[in-house]
């Protein structure tokens, strides 16, 4: 349908909705109009439609619709490069999504904001925009992983991840982080192929192709871009395909293949462009390429017979390349012109002009010394012409300046140029020389500049010389304009080739680089060097391969990158083709050509996860010791593949990968991995392996063979998870046009897809398409009659349903190529006559048209569940089986009945099965059933559309609540108990649905409670879903602790993969008060899982994450995941000790403190804090600590803070509330003598409430203790003091402390002096003071003597009052008053 026709239809439907007062329907149609207009580059008109949509949503009180309208307005403004306004609307979208607690829209909002920042970077190259884009995309990805995992269908989650991976890949490419860029692109391509996301696959391949092109990797770029072009062709997106052709033409020009570039540009021109500036650029580039092709053809003809003409053509080529900025080819053309000139012995002046052209071009290439050499040659050839010599000497001087030569080399050149200009009596040239000389002197020799400036002022310019210069410039301009006009005429003369038929163009592309030369029919190649056998292996055409080999096609030809047909068959997983090629002598261990990096067919198969192919190669003697250029053996290739795609592999694929690993290990150790004898290739070949015929002729397949064709065998041989490798596994992007057959997303239901490590090749669409193409008749005849009858009955049951049961149709543009389906019953049982009559013309369901974009560099932001907002949906057409009469009028598909649904509703409603076998063949159908009732049920953030089937028993509200609960359980893994409300009114469970609800009504479901299985079962289910084995110690902990108030899994050294199922099992453990995970390996990557679990634990009061390898990035994720939620609102104790947080975590720590308003204990021992701690984020941290009103205990021990950092820290602490402060070993070194000053100032603060102070291991001495004693009277609340492990504290300090305590109202409840230099004997009087002022004293010193122990023993019975106890063991002496 044409654009104008679609616009008219939508505008008509919009006007009808407006007259009917249906604001939601009108808003939905405004949305569709805006999307349609934007898809064709009419952004201003699209923006107006989205503004109307926003106003209608606001009037209809639809907050979610308003949010989406803001997003679309922001996207249109970004496309119009009004980025501040775009970000304003996108942040409004974010706020609305946040207020609605709609995680799906939150994910989209962050992705959209990230995309806009990426556009800003493209516009102004701001690194800050890149960092903001990265942060936004990471937030969006975290929401997908933490909030949406388990709540949406896996296909939608994969679509979201696909686009976010692509956006992150683009971001890291701009940040020049190549490794991360490549990883994200590979993940994006894998998920896009796995889920048939053609538009996202197009973007990923297109952008990866341009990245390879900019990096000079032309072979990889061509394959990625060809894959992108095929995706665009599959989607029937002409503008996207045109952009691919333009970039392909650029790559081909870089490679020097202008003939192929011409074909690509002509195709781009015919396909059209979305923007006029793009079309103008294509025209300009096409004119250039056409001119180059014409001149190259003329040069080829003239080289042998007309050297004079060839010399002229070389000059024209050089000028053409130079004008286009292709300076290396321009220099090459001028060099060839110079050789012809020397061959023809042309005059010196003529050759001098060629040297000038070469020098100028080398200067443009920054080869300034090379330019000087050609200027010197020009000088030699122009000897005696002082004017030309002057200009040449000036050029030499300027080139030497550009090369960075010293002033001593520049000055003589300028002087000679000035002298020649004076001899030629050219004042204007003299002035020019002096101006350049003056500029150089100011920079390199300032003392000589005044003299030159004086000469410049004295020099006058003659009027006639000015006129002469102007005349020369005018002549040069006219010449340039004449050249441009000639090029336009030239391009117009080439337009007659645009009428080529598609078949002729295909033949032209197949011949590719052969040009006019004749070659063998087996040497016909396309632009990538692929032969007919390559293409047949890529497309999986077994019979075509057999025919080619039987006719003598070489078995081992290479394409231009170096791949052989066997590589291709292994790459695409065509098992039977691999078997056939090996049977006929294909080289099993071929390492490929120059561009293949030593990848053998076995590496190739393992790199794509085709384990059956790899097993066959091993049977046939493939080497397991050969390594790629990166040093990878086949076993290491498999391990790398598993590591990359571990998260996306299903359990069956993991098992197969383990089995293949064992097989490779057995083969590497010399054991025979198979019972059958391995196939051995001949030790020598008589002919070149690239051109030798097959070793044995290909036998004709017997007509009565019982062996199933390839596709059938694939289904029989492998498990459902691997059935039909052409459709169940994504292929590498590679190669040219896809076959004419169609593809469908619906086929993926055959089993879980498997990932493939991709080398940069073009589209796998051909193979995916082939998976949808019905097989030959023999395939269909192999099915049994019972299977046919079962399929027939299932099809009949589906006819006449209220809703269409058709799965997603094939991509647009390929529906005509589908072969007709085979009959559902055997021929011998077929009824005579036409017994099936349709009440409407047969039509084929088509997929909704994917959203397009004008700029494919622009990353996508929306998720996969956005279909109802951006694509018009057509009502599924019904086909009824009639017996007595047929309907004369076809059913028209009116405007979409679901177009007015709010975003988030399922795009395809569920349909219940009709009861009974009412549609048996031969029975007339009764009257058509009434239309079904469909009810929308909102359960928290999820909206379900539930059909109520017609039956003899009318369903009740209780049935509807149960259906909604079951759907929520399937989506989220949690089973709620629900009550239903309609517009605030509570619906009674016993009421019948038709009595209280109408079709399309929306009811609100309130969760009264959750039906949670035991924690052990939840842990086991989580392990199964993640493909992770159960950890026995964790299982014991789960069984013992169950759903109690505390859970501990300490010191188990659990890694991230082992912690993930545990954290998921603990979700919604609402009664949990204490969670202890100390001594594990949480790391930064598992924090997202932790945050998701913490969000469901509202009662959590203690969280211990000590010694968990948590870094600054992990702390940042933890802090970012908490604000705005109820997470950790009840947390009272947090332990982050022994994690390498570092000085840069200040902002994250501040956010964490703000997110925990009731926090009373914070432990940060040994976190790697240093002197810079508190420096970069002093304001944020200070504010956070001051606002921590409930903080009672803070431990910063074992962090080498030093005096300055400690001072900043203590200055920010709340002195009036903090009771317990641990500062053990915080000195930066032994010489940190000022450490106690900030402590003294803190203790002297008015209202200081500190009760416990630990200062152990800080290199303190008696002087520090004396100063501390002065503060004891200022801080009467201090009752516990630990000064242990300070070996410079002596007995004098103890006496000083006891004397000070006598002046206080109360003594100390604890004094720690272990590891100090307290030396005995202390004397009986000192022991009396100890007993009077201290409730507990710890001494641990080798310097105590026997008299001290005797004095303590004598002291105990003589004192009345509370009892006392002592511990005297070796050097330890502990005293406590009970």
Curated annotation (Swiss-Prot):
Q: Which Gene3D superfamilies does UniProt cross-reference here?
A: Ankyrin repeat-containing domain, Ribonuclease Inhibitor, Tetratricopeptide repeat domain
**InterPro entries in alphabetical order:** Ankyrin_rpt (IPR002110), Ankyrin_rpt-contain_sf (IPR036770), Leu-rich_rpt (IPR001611), LRR_dom_sf (IPR032675), MMS22L-TONSL_complex_comp (IPR052311), TPR-like_helical_dom_sf (IPR011990), TPR_rpt (IPR019734)
Q: Which domain of life is it from?
A: Eukaryota
Q: What is the effect of changing residue 563 to A?
A: Abolished interaction with histone H4 and recruitment to replication forks without affecting interaction with MMS22L
The impact of changing residue 1288 to Q is: In SEMDSP; uncertain significance
Compositional bias, Basic residues, is annotated for 514-523
Instruction: Give me the LRR repeat coordinates as residue ranges.
Output: 1069-1093, 1097-1122, 1128-1151, 1188-1212, 1247-1270, 1275-1300, 1331-1354
What is this protein's function?
A: Component of the MMS22L-TONSL complex, a complex that promotes homologous recombination-mediated repair of double-strand breaks (DSBs) at stalled or collapsed replication forks. The MMS22L-TONSL complex is required to maintain genome integrity during DNA replication. It mediates the assembly of RAD51 filaments on single-stranded DNA (ssDNA): the MMS22L-TONSL complex is recruited to DSBs following histone replacement by histone chaperones and eviction of the replication protein A complex (RPA/RP-A) from DSBs.
Disorder association:
Spondyloepimetaphyseal dysplasia, sponastrime type: An autosomal recessive bone disease characterized by spine abnormalities, mid-face hypoplasia with a depressed nasal bridge, and striation of the metaphyses. Additional features include disproportionate short stature with exaggerated lumbar lordosis, scoliosis, coxa vara, limited elbow extension, small dysplastic epiphyses, childhood cataracts, short dental roots, and hypogammaglobulinemia. Disease severity and clinical manifestations are variable. Some patients have intellectual disability.
Oligomeric state and interaction partners are given as:
Component of the MMS22L-TONSL complex, a complex at least composed of MMS22L and TONSL/NFKBIL2. Interacts with the MCM complex, the FACT complex and the RPA complex. Interacts with MCM5; the interaction is direct. Binds histones, with a strong preference for histone H3.1 (histones H3.1 and H3-4/H3.1t). Interacts (via ANK repeats) with histone H4; specifically binds histone H4 lacking methylation at 'Lys-20' (H4K20me0). May interact with DNAJC9; the interaction seems to be histone-dependent.
Protein name per UniProt:
Tonsoku-like protein
Q: Which organism is it from?
A: Homo sapiens (Human)
Q: What broad taxonomic lineage does this protein's source fall under?
A: Eukaryota, Metazoa, Chordata, Craniata, Vertebrata
């Amino acid at each position: 349908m044409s654009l104008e026709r679609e616009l008219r239809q939508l505008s008509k439907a919009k006007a009808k909705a407006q007259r009917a007062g249906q604001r939601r329907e009108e808003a939905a149609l405004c949305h569709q109009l805006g999307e349609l207009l934007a898809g064709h580059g009419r952004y201003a008109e699209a923006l107006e439609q989205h503004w109307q949509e926003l106003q209608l949503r606001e009037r209809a009180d639809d907050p979610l619709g308003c949010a989406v309208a803001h997003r679309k307005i922001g996207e249109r403004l970004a496309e119009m490069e009004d980025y501040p306004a775009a970000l304003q609307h996108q942040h409004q979208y974010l706020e609305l999504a946040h207020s609605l607690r709609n995680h799906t829209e939150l994910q989209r909002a962050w992705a959209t904001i990230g995309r806009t920042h990426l556009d800003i970077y493209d516009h102004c190259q701001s690194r800050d925009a890149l960092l903001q884009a990265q942060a936004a995309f990471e937030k969006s990805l975290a929401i997908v992983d933490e909030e949406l995992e388990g709540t949406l269908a896996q296909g939608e989650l994969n679509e979201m991840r696909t686009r976010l991976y692509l956006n992150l890949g683009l971001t890291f490419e701009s940040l020049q982080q190549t490794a991360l860029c490549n990883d994200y692109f590979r993940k994006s391509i894998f998920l896009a192929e796995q889920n048939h996301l053609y538009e996202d696959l197009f973007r990923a391949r297109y952008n990866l192709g341009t990245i390879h092109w900019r990096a000079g990797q032309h072979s990889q770029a061509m394959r990625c871009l060809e894959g992108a072009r095929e995706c665009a062709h599959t989607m029937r997106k002409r503008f996207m395909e045109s952009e691919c052709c333009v970039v392909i033409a650029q790559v081909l020009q870089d490679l020097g293949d202008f003939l192929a570039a011409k074909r690509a540009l002509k195709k781009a021109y015919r396909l059209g462009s979305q923007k006029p500036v793009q079309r103008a650029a294509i025209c300009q580039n096409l004119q250039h390429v056409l001119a180059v092709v014409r001149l190259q053809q003329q040069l080829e003809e003239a080289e042998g017979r007309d050297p004079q003409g060839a010399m002229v053509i070389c000059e024209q080529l050089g000028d053409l390349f130079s004008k286009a900025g292709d300076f290396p080819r321009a220099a090459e053309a001028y060099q060839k012109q110079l050789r012809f000139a020397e061959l023809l012995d042309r005059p010196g002046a003529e050759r001098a002009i060629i040297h000038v052209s070469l020098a100028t071009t080398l200067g443009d290439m920054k080869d300034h010394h090379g330019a000087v050499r050609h200027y010197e040659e020009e000088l030699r050839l122009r000897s005696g012409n002082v004017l030309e010599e002057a200009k040449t000497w000036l050029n030499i001087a300027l080139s030497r300046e550009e090369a960075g030569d010293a002033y001593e080399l520049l000055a003589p050149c300028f002087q000679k140029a000035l002298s020649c200009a004076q001899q030629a009596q050219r004042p204007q040239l003299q002035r020019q020389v002096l101006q350049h000389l003056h500029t150089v002197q100011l920079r390199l020799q300032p003392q000589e500049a005044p003299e030159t400036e004086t000469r410049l002022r004295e020099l006058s310019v003659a009027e006639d010389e000015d006129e002469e210069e102007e005349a020369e410039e005018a002549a040069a301009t006219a010449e340039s304009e004449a050249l441009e006009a000639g090029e336009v005429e030239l391009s117009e003369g080439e337009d007659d080739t645009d009428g080529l038929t598609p078949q002729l163009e295909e033949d032209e592309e197949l011949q590719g680089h052969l040009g006019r030369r004749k070659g063998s029919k087996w040497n016909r190649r396309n632009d990538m060097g692929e032969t007919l056998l390559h293409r047949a292996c890529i497309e999986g055409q077994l019979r075509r391969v057999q025919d080619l080999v039987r006719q003598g096609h070489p078995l081992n030809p290479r394409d231009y990158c170096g791949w052989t047909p066997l590589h291709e068959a292994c790459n695409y997983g065509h098992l039977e083709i691999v078997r056939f090629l090996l049977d006929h002598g294909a080289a099993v261990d071929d390492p490929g050509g120059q561009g293949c990096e030593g990848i053998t067919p076995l590496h190739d198969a393992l790199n794509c996860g085709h384990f059956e192919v790899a097993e066959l190669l091993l049977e046939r003697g493939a080497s397991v010791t050969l390594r790629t250029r990166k040093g990878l053996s086949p076993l290491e290739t498999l391990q790398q593949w598993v590591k990359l795609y571990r998260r996306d592999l299903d359990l069956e694929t993991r098992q197969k990968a383990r089995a293949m690993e064992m097989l490779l290990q057995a083969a590497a150790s010399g054991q025979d991995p198979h019972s059958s004898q391995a196939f051995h290739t001949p030790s020598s070949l008589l002919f070149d392996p690239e051109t030798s015929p097959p070793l044995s002729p290909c036998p004709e397949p017997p007509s009565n063979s019982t062996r199933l064709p390839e596709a059938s065998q694939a289904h029989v041989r492998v498990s459902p998870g691997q059935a039909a490798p052409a459709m169940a596994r994504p292929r590498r992007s590679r190669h040219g046009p896809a076959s004419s057959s169609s593809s469908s997303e619906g086929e993926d239901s055959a089993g879980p897809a498997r990932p493939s490590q991709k080398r940069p090749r073009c589209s796998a669409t051909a193979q995916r398409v082939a998976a949808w193409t019905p097989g030959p008749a023999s395939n269909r005849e192999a099915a049994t009659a019972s299977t046919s009858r079962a399929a027939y009955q299932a099809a009949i049951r589906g006819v006449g349903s209220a809703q269409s049961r058709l799965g997603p149709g094939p991509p647009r543009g390929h529906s005509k190529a589908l072969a007709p389906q085979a009959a559902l019953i055997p021929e011998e049982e077929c009824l005579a006559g036409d017994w099936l009559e349709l009440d409407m013309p047969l039509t084929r369901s088509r997929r909704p048209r994917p959203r397009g974009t004008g700029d494919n560099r622009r990353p996508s932001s929306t998720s996969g569940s956005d279909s109802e907002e951006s694509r018009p949906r057509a009502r599924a057409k019904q086909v009824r089986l009639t017996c007595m009469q047929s309907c004369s009028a076809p059913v028209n598909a009116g405007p979409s009945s679901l177009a007015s649904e709010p975003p988030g509703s399922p795009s395809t409603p569920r349909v219940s099965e009709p009861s009974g076998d009412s549609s048996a063949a031969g029975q007339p159908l009764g009257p058509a059933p009434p239309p079904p009732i469909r009810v929308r049920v909102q359960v928290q953030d999820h909206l379900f559309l539930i059909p109520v089937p017609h039956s003899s028993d009318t369903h009740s509200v209780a049935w509807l609540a149960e259906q909604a609960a079951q759907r929520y359980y399937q989506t989220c893994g949690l089973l709620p108990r629900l009550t239903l409300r309609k517009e605030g009114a509570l619906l009674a469970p016993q009421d019948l649905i038709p009595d209280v609800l109408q079709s399309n009504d929306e009811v609100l479901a309130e969760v009264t409670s959750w039906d949670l299985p035991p924690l052990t079962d939840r842990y086991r289910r989580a392990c199964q879903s993640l493909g992770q084995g159960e950890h026995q110690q964790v299982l014991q902990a789960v069984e013992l602790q169950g759903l109690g108030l505390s859970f501990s899994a300490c010191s188990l050294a659990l890694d991230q993969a082992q912690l993930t199922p545990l954290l998921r099992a603990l979700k919604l453990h609402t009664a949990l008060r204490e969670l202890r995970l100390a001594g594990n390996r949480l790391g930064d990557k598992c924090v997202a899982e932790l945050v998701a679990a913490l969000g469901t634990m509202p009662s959590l009061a203690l969280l211990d994450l000590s010694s968990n390898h948590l870094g600054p990035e992990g702390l940042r994720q933890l802090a970012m995941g908490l604000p705005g939620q109820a997470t950790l609102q009840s947390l009272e104790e947090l332990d982050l000790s022994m994690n390498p947080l570092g000085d840069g975590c200040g902002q994250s720590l501040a956010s964490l403190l703000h997110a925990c308003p009731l926090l009373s204990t914070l432990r940060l021992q040994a976190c790697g804090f240093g002197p810079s701690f508190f420096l970069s984020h002093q304001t944020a941290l200070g504010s956070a600590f001051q606002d921590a009103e409930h903080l009672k205990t803070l431990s910063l021990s074992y962090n080498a803070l030093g005096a300055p950092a400690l001072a900043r820290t203590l200055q920010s602490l709340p002195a009036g509330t903090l009771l317990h402060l641990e500062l053990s070993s915080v000195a930066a070194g032994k010489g940190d003598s000022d450490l106690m000053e900030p402590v003294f100032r803190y203790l002297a603060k008015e209202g200081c409430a500190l009760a416990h102070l630990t200062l152990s291991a800080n290199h303190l001495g008696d002087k520090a203790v004396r100063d501390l004693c002065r503060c004891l009277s200022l801080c009467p609340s201090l009752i516990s003091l630990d000064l242990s492990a300070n070996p410079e504290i002596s007995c004098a300090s103890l006496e000083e402390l006891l004397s000070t305590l006598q002046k206080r109202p109360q003594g100390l409840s604890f004094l720690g002096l272990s590891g100090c230099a307290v030396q005995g004997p202390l004397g009986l009087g000192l022991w009396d003071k100890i007993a009077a002022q201290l409730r507990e004293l710890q001494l641990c010193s080798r310097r105590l003597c026997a008299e001290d122990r005797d004095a303590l023993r004598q002291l105990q019975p003589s004192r009345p009052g509370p009892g006392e106890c002592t511990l005297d063991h070796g050097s330890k002496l502990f005293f406590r008053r009970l």
